[in-house]
């Protein structure tokens, strides 16, 4: 039995903290306390709940630099990214607070009376956050769930619990009821399973691998428990010949090197029309070489380390040592470093071209025409994100509709905004997070008919 988890700085391998591991018994106690706090929270006037969430957002803003530095230390994120993530949490809390007083039902015309619907909170929601974006993704589940009147039990990843613990402290300082937002550090096998299987938890929100997501889905099925799953990805970056090839090549590296490639939206399959394939690669070489890899606390750094030695070994295993391609540089010495890598001459069905590597690795594959591009783009089990580079508006719309993925960008690699929906097709998940309907995903619809005929 693991009683505590060691948090390491992935850039230095130094011990940052040891955090007690939550037991199954402690999860059960937390659920009971959360249920009581949720009743108090749901009974508050909507304006009061919104005010407290806005206060929470203000405190996150005041502590943004400390949160960002924690994210750098425990997750290896670059300082620029970590600052964006802290701001994203602040903005999402504000956005969710704005929805509290707008979470309305409907009046539906019926004969013989009045029919109305109510959106009621589920109760206690379990949020299982990943290690790749521990701070913002924790808020993606927690903020709308709280805004809809629920309590939240957040289980962070074993390697990255520190920002979650700080968020819970800020929630208390903001005046949210005690036990309404609790953080339960621990292993997936113990704390995670206890959260998923507890009958008092009405919904589970999980972000992580497709393999673990399937296990959670099976456990939720035993109790017909609601769930949202944001899982893996192997997203395409489709470059047509009519686009500015130099601009497309310059934009490509950070579409898969952001967070050292540990991003489910990473555009790790670069599909380039054959007529411009060689020219694209010529421009891609200097673009990859120019990416600054190093100390994530340095404001000039664009890419930091992988999260752990285990992740480093997984990436090494999936990347063929003798493959042709483009390789950037990475620091030697301590830390979990892997250089930016672009592979060419890879078969479209090779593991590195179809499986989620979750590292700074992409493959470049040629395609002939629009139909061939769509076929290649859809030739994985995933469907989370993708980019389409073209000057032809008609083609952009046709390909956007034909690619089986939930989040597509044209002439851009943007995938996540807190005010637009986010989620995947196929093996990339179930449900949507963020956006204008985020709060409704944490409610039940109740229909009430009131007869008016004597």
Task: Please give the residue ranges for each predicted region.
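Short loop/turn microsegments at loop-to-beta-strand junctions
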Residues: 2-5, 267, 384
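Structural signal for hydrophobic packing residues in well-ordered secondary-structure cores
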Residues: 35-38, 42, 57-64, 68, ...
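Short, well-ordered beta-strand elements within core beta-sheets of diverse protein domains
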Residues: 16-22, 37-43, 127, 237-240, ...
